[in-house]
């Protein structure tokens, strides 16, 4: 291994899972582990085998299935933990035992009730026992960020002497700042005589929002392994996010000269979405690299710049992480250049329309809707102002019966005619969707469905967003209500009306 390769140690399945309200199932963990392997992660920390029988079985199954990544299990500096970790890992092609003990004065005195000499002795014994099972042993000085530096240096020196091949320096509570954390790593390299015999790793938490910054600062001082999680999942405020540190290394090669990872960056986005779906942890829209707004532009000035040269406002190409769709949002802040480009993409020559007229109508629509989609813009070309938001379909009544066979009854107004249908489904939302499809005689495919709370309390409003695909085109719908079924119905009908308007546009184009 070259000195400038940064080893990516992913702990989504161990530290990341600790942040979840409930444990993941064995097959869910395996699905994530296989995705991490496909992403190119070097080391996957699969769990803490001694913590539960379920975790033991999950680590064991992952160890038997993953072949290209080293599988790691966590253990305290206790014989039973280390033995259990080995039993879970021994079927793996490549495995690592990761043992740890707290080294800060606060943790030693108040949590462990031991002095430094006792902690040092426990650490050495644990490493020696782990080495009896494998040469690949990692040792962590828990709460290293608040450990007296002389104690930390002495602990690291003795851990390496005992046989640890990787020494992890965690900022367990996210207390240190980048320059401070960098200095800790620098001092270790200057004062620990056998530091060259081990790989120095860092594990940074995000309590002060600097986990990625701390990790990058450590690389510059000699750290060669970064412990991180997908989407920054982890205890409290989370961990260093894999996608952030990897893309920082890739993007800032001018500053982080020579450093690289083996991560297949084009798989980052789909791995992020998979972990989000399995853990039921939504990704904040403003999350760096993988948030829905990370590559979105709504300001007219920004959009104009991106249309001329993407690098004016994008330091990373969306395709670099596996995003291949346009994230230019049409809102009331969009300028004429954006509208003109969108119309060109829809196939309209600028000589066939009056841009000022279309833009004026666009602004009126954007003020009403917030976000305008390409099919809305196309409707402006063919429908009168009064019909731009014409709703062919309106829900008049809605009732749902839950139970063994969820059933919905929907009454809709189509022009002046009322139509009623009752349908079943796997759940009440699907039953409503089936009713609307039958009444409208349109059969789009549901591609995305999401719920977000718009307020708190028992009377909280929920917003439902749906994406329907019809004839190869996606249509968005939104609904808001204190009743999630009603909000879902509103969202479906909103999307169906968009489909209706697009069909009407096609008729006008053919006329």
From Swiss-Prot:
Pfam families: HCS_D2, HMGL-like, LeuA_dimer. SUPFAM superfamilies: 2-isopropylmalate synthase LeuA, allosteric (dimerisation) domain, Aldolase. One of its GO terms (molecular function) is 2-isopropylmalate synthase activity. Keywords: Amino-acid biosynthesis, Branched-chain amino acid biosynthesis, Cytoplasm, Leucine biosynthesis, Manganese, Metal-binding, Transferase. InterPro entries: 2-IPM_HCS-like, 2-isopropylmalate_synth_dimer, AIPM/Hcit_synth_CS, Aldolase_TIM, LeuA/HCS_post-cat, LeuA_allosteric_dom_sf, LeuA_bact_synth, PYR_CT. CDD domains: DRE_TIM_IPMS. GO terms for biological process: L-leucine biosynthetic process. It catalyses: 3-methyl-2-oxobutanoate + acetyl-CoA + H2O = (2S)-2-isopropylmalate + CoA + H(+). PROSITE patterns: AIPM_HOMOCIT_SYNTH_1 (PS00815), AIPM_HOMOCIT_SYNTH_2 (PS00816), PYR_CT (PS50991). One of its GO terms (cellular component) is cytosol. Pathway: Amino-acid biosynthesis; L-leucine biosynthesis; L-leucine from 3-methyl-2-oxobutanoate: step 1/4. Mn(2+) binds at residues 15, 203, 205, 239. Its main location: cytoplasm. Residues 6-269 form the Pyruvate carboxyltransferase domain. Its EC number is 2.3.3.13. Residues 394-511 are annotated as: Regulatory domain. Its cofactor is Mn(2+). PANTHER family: 2-ISOPROPYLMALATE SYNTHASE 1, CHLOROPLASTIC-RELATED (PTHR10277:SF9), HOMOCITRATE SYNTHASE-RELATED (PTHR10277). Homodimer. Belongs to the alpha-IPM synthase/homocitrate synthase family. LeuA type 1 subfamily. Catalyzes the condensation of the acetyl group of acetyl-CoA with 3-methyl-2-oxobutanoate (2-ketoisovalerate) to form 3-carboxy-3-hydroxy-4-methylpentanoate (2-isopropylmalate). This is 2-isopropylmalate synthase. The lineage of its organism: Bacteria, Pseudomonadati, Campylobacterota, Epsilonproteobacteria, Campylobacterales.
